[in-house]
A protein has these predicted regions:
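Buried hydrophobic core positions in alpha-solenoid tandem helical repeats
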Residues: 1-2, 43-46, 93-97
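Long alpha-helical HEAT/HEAT-like repeat alpha-solenoid scaffolds in very large eukaryotic proteins
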Residues: 36-37, 41, 45-50, 142, ...
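Eukaryotic acidic, Ser/Thr-rich intrinsically disordered low-complexity regions
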Residues: 90-156
Length: 156
């Protein structure tokens, strides 16, 4: 199944993506780990650049289910999510970040959830508020205004 997902013609890859996503949705952690060992992450990540929003969504759901298992396995040992590392190595993180610009709101929402939950990435709109502003060739970082009456450093 993973080989079909990776190398078959698009129509067959779509069906394989459905099957793998369904397996990650209802499968045990051992079954999901087996799919990962067989190499399902990279072909799922490759589907993220496709033009069919339904297949992109299916691939995102499969990746999210895999990341969830990785998180559950990492938590007791206070370790890194190995599945997140594998997704990053398969260029999945970059592709998920790029999908934040997708016109389909469901895809956008799923990407935000994955990035915030498994990669510690904040929503772009929140990050934009933290960007320095430039005025008169000087940068401002949105520092809070001084309290009325100024600061009191006398220690009283």
């Amino acid at each position: 199944l993973v080989q079909l997902l990776a190398k078959a013609e698009f129509e067959i890859r779509k069906e394989a993506a459905w099957a793998i996503s369904n397996a990650t949705s209802g499968g045990s952690p051992a079954q999901i780990n087996f799919l990962v060992q067989q190499g399902c992450i990279r072909p799922l990540c490759d589907l993220l650049t496709g033009s069919d929003p339904k297949i992109v969504t299916i691939a995102l759901e499969g990746i999210e289910n895999i990341l969830k298992v990785g998180e559950e396995e990492a938590k007791p040992m206070n370790a890194q999510n190995q599945m997140a590392i594998l997704v990053s190595e398969a260029e999945g993180l970059n592709k998920i970040e790029d999908l934040q610009q997708h016109s389909n709101n469901d895809i956008y929402e799923k990407c935000i959830k994955i990035l915030e939950t498994y990669f510690g990435v904040e929503d772009d709109s929140e990050m934009a508020n933290l960007a320095p502003s430039e005025e008169n060739n000087q940068f401002g970082f949105g520092a809070a205004a001084a309290p009325q009456g100024g600061f009191d450093f006398s220690g009283q």
